[in-house]
């Protein structure tokens, strides 16, 4: 359940950035795409950190 919510949030955060990056990539050589990708990756990492406890047990469904 939490993984699917996390995936939906990830899509919501990355899609607007990706679309904006594509329209700006013609003027700055794709630099906007790289920044959008980095920002999305950082946000996804933060979401994953918040979903798992610091000491993850094998029974934890949020830990991969």
Swiss-Prot record:
May contain a 4-hydroxyproline. Transmembrane segments: none annotated. Keywords: Acetylcholine receptor inhibiting toxin, Amidation, Disulfide bond, Hydroxylation, Ion channel impairing toxin, Neurotoxin, Postsynaptic neurotoxin, Secreted, Signal, Toxin. Disulfide bonds join 52-60, 56-63. Its main location: secreted. Expressed by the venom duct. It comes from the Eukaryota. Coiled coil: none annotated. The keyword Secreted applies. The record marks 57 as: Binds AChR. The cysteine framework is XIV (C-C-C-C). Alpha-conotoxins act on postsynaptic membranes, they bind to the nicotinic acetylcholine receptors (nAChR) and thus inhibit them. This synthetic peptide displays analgesic activity in a hot plate assay. Analgesia is also observed against second phase pain in formalin-induced inflammatory pain model, and in a rat model of mechanically-induced pain. Effects downstream of nAChR are inhibition of calcium influx, inhibition of ERK1/2 phosphorylation and inhibition of c-fos/NOS expression. Genes associated with drug dependence are not up-regulated by this toxin. This is Alpha-conotoxin Lt14.1. It comes from Conus litteratus (Lettered cone).
């Amino acid at each position: 359940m939490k993984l699917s919510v996390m995936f939906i949030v990830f899509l919501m955060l990355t899609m607007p950035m990706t679309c904006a990056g594509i329209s700006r990539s013609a003027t700055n050589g794709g630099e906007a795409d790289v920044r959008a990708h980095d920002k999305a990756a950082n946000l996804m990492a933060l979401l994953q950190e918040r979903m798992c406890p610091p000491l993850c047990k094998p029974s934890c469904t949020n830990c991969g």
